């Protein structure tokens, strides 16, 4: 199952990938495609943006007679990755709280009551 991902989340994934080891574009895209349905036409502008911001640097290396462009994280990129990791944790915790709250309230029958109240309030506005 794929969930929609924002450009910011893709940036976070890219920085996380190149933090582990220098990687080339296709390799990065294949790793991200394990969890998100993205196209190279989406990925490369984000890589360029990260390079322009100073979060990654690039270098070329030959592999089986062909040149590959590798991306390497910078210290600024590590700082940005840590920031995005904090944002991701906060986002994930919020989603988990909503899901857990819903489960608990379903067990207690509260969600059903809240749903009815919301429907009634919506009907009154019409």
Please place each PLM-identified region on the residue numbering:
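Basic, amphipathic "hinge/linker" alpha-helix immediately C-terminal to the N-terminal HTH DNA-binding motif
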Residues: 63-85
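N-terminal helix-turn-helix DNA-binding core of bacterial DNA-binding proteins
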Residues: 2-44
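Generic recognition of well-ordered alpha-helical segments
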Residues: 30, 75, 90-93
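Amphipathic alpha-helical dimerization/coiled-coil segments
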Residues: 82-126
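Alpha-helical DNA-recognition elements
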Residues: 45, 49
